[in-house]
Amino acid sequence: MQNTDRKRNVAILGSTGSIGCQALDVIRRNNDLYAAYILTANNSADQLIQQAREFQPEAVVIANEEHYEKVKEALADLPIKVYAGPDSLCDVVTDSNVDIVLGSMVGFAGLRPTISAIKAGKYIALANKETLVVAGELIKQLAYDHHVPILPVDSEHSAIFQCLEPGNPVEKILLTASGGPFRKYSPEQIATVTKDQALAHPTWNMGAKITIDSATLMNKGFEVIEAKWLFDVSPDQIQVVVHPQSVIHSMVQFEDGAVKAQLGMPDMRLPIQYAFSYPHRLKSDFERLDFFQLKDLTFERPDADRFRCLALAYEALRQGGNMPCIVNAANEVVNLAFRQDRIGFNDIASVIEQTMQKAVFTRERSIEVYLDTDAEARRIAEELIAK
């Protein structure tokens, strides 16, 4: 249970991204309870400067050192410490005044700072799903060893967390998915999809990388892996349910057959706020769900033949070891390549699958293994794209 007799200091890893910006809005609306203590960005220097001037954090980090002088100069009139480089991300989260670390960086880059925060005993609000995809077993053990709670920020995992009942085992997790913009496309149509079509997500406001992952259903595959580590269930206990309206954020089925669901408007600020305030709920003026305005709620099975990435994620989870790390690295490479018009939509799954076959498999788990695996899988994926 959180101590709420003073403002809680939040370190936001990735404050200029979609989740980071929405987290700052939560802090803005609850500035009597939370303070943005540390803000970080990779390349978005102008936005980081703007955020720093509004929220007056203790420190900011610009991970790309090329932007250091620009940020330092722009904030020279304020008592804000300015750091640069990836190692600084790992350092700032250990500050004794930091209460909550929101991991909202995109991709593998979020792993090392999250590990540093866990080792420093910080309360973790986790939006960076790749951390658990790549190193779920290691992260879970570290969190256990350091008595650190990990609160999910993903809307689906937040929903599942809210549905759980202590002492009542889960029979099945029903993980909902919008199905993406190509849910009804034929295989022929999917083959010709463009990046502009893929970047137009029907429901959620997200960054470019995760929007493409949602279109391929790799995002949902990663959420399956994330759910396994967060909720200690087997792959066979996680069922993906396509629910295009995104009103039901996920469901839990118990051993007696009862199903609990968490519903709400698709607004990421709600799970962010809940992760900050747990076990309490804060009053908000977020849009309410109006049941009388709801159209039909529909449910479908996902098509793993048309959307191979979902099947590949399940396969990686069943294999275990460093295979999810291989999939994540290859996916980061092909996702960017697709956004750069270097490959077609169907090449995304093809390159990932070939990388899974070529990369060295190991069951060892350490940060060094994951770093080596990540580098090797990226190299293989780049070589496959270049062919």
What are these regions (language model features)?
Residues 1-387:
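Catalytic, metal-anchored helix/loop core of enzyme active sites in primary metabolism
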